[in-house]
């Protein structure tokens, strides 16, 4: 998508001084996540695993000489008892409590389990490494089953034991990808607003909260200083789960006309919130709509009417008849990647992180974010436990360039951390809370990310 610079209506403050909203250069990088020429012909998921292993193995092979140059690199089939070597492959975690689809089919659909565990970890879980030649069970304490998940590609230093397992002595991960050098910090600051989990149409949704947020962004609340800050907001990203449709309407039954209209009500309400005209004594201009005031990206989430499997494709623009008339409105993919003034943003609506919390453990959600960067993969558990499209010749979730901002939406609370890589990479990690529950949106300074 070509770069975009837009003119926006000026804002006025109490002193009648006009404030012009700042502008930024936008570049969409979602092409990798778009399913355009892909055709489903009944292919299996093995091909996406082969593509992932091929790409990651090439990368890890290039890192081995600086890690353990004195050791030979072997395949699983070439392992010899007691001989130290390095093997590269895809991890598979054998989990005692992992739900089995065959068990689900064997139960009656109407019977729900009494307990739905939020985490399927068990002390008897163990890891297996697999390549094209075979698989081997892993032992030792260097590779904790509680940290790793199925789908991660690693290099392991160790040796085969008499029991036929591979005793791991050291682990090499891909590490943070290279990062494009950021432009020098500018004195002219700009801000990006992230909000997720609006859940319009749910019982927990409060339109008044969102209205207050819109008023802040458009410069209709606060004193001169706050309105001056609003003029520095150059972009808004809605990170998934914008609406929530009653499950009673999604049971696969034919709907009467009344229920059919109820399906679209949440989107009608959201579109109105994004396009309504604000009345203000500060200005005579009637164009103060958030969709017209600044560029707006909207990503699909797990509760939105989009395809279930990742990467989720953009929400159909016909759902937003009012917002879609503005060239500042963009319906984007999930995951979503873009650049603002050469600052790279990468993020998801939260499904990848939610799945990691079910099959591994960490002290906080930011640790999960950091791991995906070090593994260079946005969704390592896909397609094992997280639905994704069966790509045949590529894995779109591989991270080949380190973002400056890495965000994930629909989390329980706001968290942030600055991650520093071994080669000088600096990444601002952000967990964006559900707005319907917390009333919190996240404002990110584009040129002062380390702050």
Question: Can you say where each PLM-predicted feature lies in the sequence?
Answer:
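Extended recognition/assembly regions associated with phosphoester-bond processing machinery
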Residues: 1-451
């Amino acid at each position: 998508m070509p770069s975009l610079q837009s003119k926006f209506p000026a804002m006025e403050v109490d002193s009648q001084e006009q404030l012009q909203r700042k502008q930024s250069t936008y570049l969409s990088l979602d092409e990798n996540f778009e399913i355009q020429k892909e055709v489903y012909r009944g292919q299996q998921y093995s091909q996406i695993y082969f593509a992932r292993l091929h790409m990651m193995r090439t990368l890890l092979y290039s890192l081995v000489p600086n890690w353990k140059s004195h050791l030979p690199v072997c395949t699983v089939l070439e392992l010899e008892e007691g001989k130290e070597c390095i093997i590269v492959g895809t991890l598979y975690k054998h989990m005692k409590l992992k739900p089995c689809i065959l068990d689900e089919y064997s139960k009656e659909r109407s019977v729900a389990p009494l307990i739905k565990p939020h985490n399927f970890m068990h002390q008897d879980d163990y890891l297996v490494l697999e390549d094209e030649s075979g698989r081997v069970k892993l032992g030792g304490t260097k590779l904790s089953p509680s940290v790793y998940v199925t789908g991660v590609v690693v290099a392991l230093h160790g040796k085969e034991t008499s029991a036929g397992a591979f005793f791991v002595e050291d682990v090499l991960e891909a590490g943070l990808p290279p990062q494009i050098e950021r432009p020098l910090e500018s004195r002219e600051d700009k801000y990006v607003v992230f909000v997720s989990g609006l859940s319009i149409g749910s019982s927990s949704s409060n339109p008044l909260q969102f209205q207050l947020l819109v008023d802040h962004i458009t410069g209709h609340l606060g004193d001169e200083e706050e309105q001056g800050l609003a003029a520095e907001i150059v972009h808004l990203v809605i990170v998934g789960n914008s609406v929530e449709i009653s499950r009673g309407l999604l049971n696969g039954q034919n709907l009467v006309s009344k229920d059919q209209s109820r399906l679209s009500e949440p989107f009608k309400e959201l579109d109105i919130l994004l396009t309504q005209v604000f009345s203000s004594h500060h200005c005579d201009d009637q164009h103060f709509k958030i969709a017209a005031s600044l560029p707006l990206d909207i990503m699909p989430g797990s509760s939105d009417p989009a395809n279930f499997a990742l990467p989720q494709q953009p929400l159909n623009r016909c759902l937003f008849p009012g917002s879609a008339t503005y060239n500042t409105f963009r319906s984007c993919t999930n995951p979503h990647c873009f650049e603002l003034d050469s600052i790279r943003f990468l993020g998801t609506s939260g499904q990848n992180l939610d799945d990691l919390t079910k099959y591994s453990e960490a002290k906080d959600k930011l640790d999960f974010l950091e791991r995906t960067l070090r593994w260079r993969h946005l969704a390592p558990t896909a397609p094992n436990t997280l639905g994704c499209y069966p790509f045949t010749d590529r894995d779109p979730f591989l991270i080949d360039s380190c973002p400056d901002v890495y965000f994930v939406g629909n989390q329980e609370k706001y968290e942030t951390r600055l991650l520093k890589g071994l080669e000088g990479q600096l990444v601002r990690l952000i967990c964006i809370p559900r707005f319907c529950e917390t009333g919190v949106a996240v404002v990110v300074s584009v040129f002062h990310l380390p702050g």
